[in-house]
Amino acid sequence: FDFDIADDLTKKLGLLLLQGWSSQSEERKINFNKWVSRHSWVEDYATFVVIREEFNMLPWWEWPQEFKIKNNKFLKSWIKKKSEEILIKKLIQWHLDEQWSVIKNFAKSRNIKLIGDLPFYVSRDSADVWSNKSLFSIFKNGDLIFQSGVPPDYFSSTGQLWGTPTYFWS
């Protein structure tokens, strides 16, 4: 997989979506705003990605202090300045969600079941962890308190450490 090509294509897609945004019908814009309201994660995700790009893809715990914590005055002001870039990220997610819905509906119409069967943990350097630190086993500086993995078994005599934070269950 060529990440550079994927990044370039994603940037081009984002610019095309933004260029077409002003000519969208009011109904389409309303649908987008409803989608954003129903998917509260997208605000944090889009903000996170734009900040990450601002700092050359550094992980969030290496960002300047004022960017590490969501919902501070500085960050709110910065978000307003970057509103167009953040909109692009949200438009891309909306576009992808629309495509995924088409795929799901096609599969369902053919009685094809889509399943996922992988252990799932969130990356430490993700919008989810950055914006919801209290839900994960991490220190304030981003270091892991506990990390996911599996003990030794048939597949690995030494076990595995995956380097992703575990969920912080109270």
Give the residues covered by each predicted segment.
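Active-site neighborhood of glycoside hydrolase catalytic domains
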Residues: 92, 96-109
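Alpha-amylase-like alpha-glycosidases and glucanotransferases acting on alpha-linked glucans and related
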Residues: 1-94, 122-170
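Conserved, mostly hydrophobic/aromatic
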Residues: 48, 107, 117
